[in-house]
């Protein structure tokens, strides 16, 4: 469970399904407003330690967006008191004028006063909806970027001497899918295909840095090697080089 302050008036709380279960809640509980849900909201606010700007602010509005694996709760400060007092409605007519009003006129006047009083809340809700749309767009963009990541990387290393190539092969302990050996312009080129899908994002850079301790990183592409280079080993090159005494 984590909290993010989006603005002076809005917080976003992300709650995983596991967190919900630990607190005896499920997504269905949010579909119909109930006392249990409200108690849960205020309990997590106490647990997460609200910013000082949200303390003692009166009424809070909650907006829930269920997701497949989590629930996003947007919390907005309200500028209207939960218990409306006629004394707060300063633009209401005085008692003499009220006495001369018909019931319809009184209701219309009261509705206008309340509408003016709640204008800030309406704007807050509209702002919250815009924030929610932006959050969803950002999440979608991040998911699309993640899906476009290639699960495999080809590393291409260059060696001036065959002995250096063999020495490097004997240092390789990381997992690889396959490897190839080419010769072009009196140099040896080793291609190594690595599956990075289940590794943390820094792994490819870390692996390249480790390879550079023993070899030169090449900017020659695999397609160039395939077209102009001489294929010495078309697969499992590293494993075969490791067998050389």
UniProtKB/Swiss-Prot annotation:
Record-linked InterPro entries: MecA_C_sf, Neg-reg_MecA
GO molecular function list: protein-macromolecule adaptor activity
NCBIfam families per the UniProt record, alphabetical: PRK02315.1-4
Listed HAMAP family: MecA
Family: Belongs to the MecA family.
Function: Enables the recognition and targeting of unfolded and aggregated proteins to the ClpC protease or to other proteins involved in proteolysis.
Domain-related comment: The N-terminal domain probably binds unfolded/aggregated proteins; the C-terminal domain interacts with ClpC.
Subunit structure: Homodimer.
Name of the featured protein: Adapter protein MecA
Organism for this UniProt entry: Streptococcus pneumoniae serotype 4 (strain ATCC BAA-334 / TIGR4)
């Amino acid at each position: 469970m984590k909290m993010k302050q989006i603005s002076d008036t809005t917080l976003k709380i992300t709650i995983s399904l596991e967190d919900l279960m630990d607190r005896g809640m499920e997504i269905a509980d949010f579909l119909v407003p109930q006392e249990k849900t409200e108690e849960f909201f205020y309990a997590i606010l106490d647990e997460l330690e609200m910013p000082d700007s949200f303390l003692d602010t009166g009424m809070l509005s909650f907006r829930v967006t269920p997701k497949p694996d989590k629930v996003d709760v947007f919390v907005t400060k309200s500028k209207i008191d939960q218990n409306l007092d006629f004394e707060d409605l300063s633009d209401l007519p005085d008692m003499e004028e009220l006495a001369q009003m018909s019931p319809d006129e009184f209701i219309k006047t009261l509705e206008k006063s309340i509408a003016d009083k709640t204008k800030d809340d309406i704007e807050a809700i509209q702002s919250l909806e815009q924030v929610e749309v932006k959050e969803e767009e950002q999440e979608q963009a991040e998911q699309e970027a993640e899906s476009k990541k290639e699960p495999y990387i080809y590393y291409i290393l260059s060696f001036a001497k065959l002995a250096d190539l063999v020495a490097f092969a004997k240092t390789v302990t990381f997992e690889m899918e396959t490897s190839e050996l080419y010769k072009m312009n009196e140099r040896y080129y080793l291609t190594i295909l690595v599956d990075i899908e289940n590794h943390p994002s820094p792994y490819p850079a870390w692996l390249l840095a480790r390879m550079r301790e023993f070899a030169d990183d090449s900017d020659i592409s695999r397609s160039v090697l395939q077209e102009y280079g001489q294929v010495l080993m078309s697969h499992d090159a590293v494993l075969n080089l490791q067998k050389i005494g």
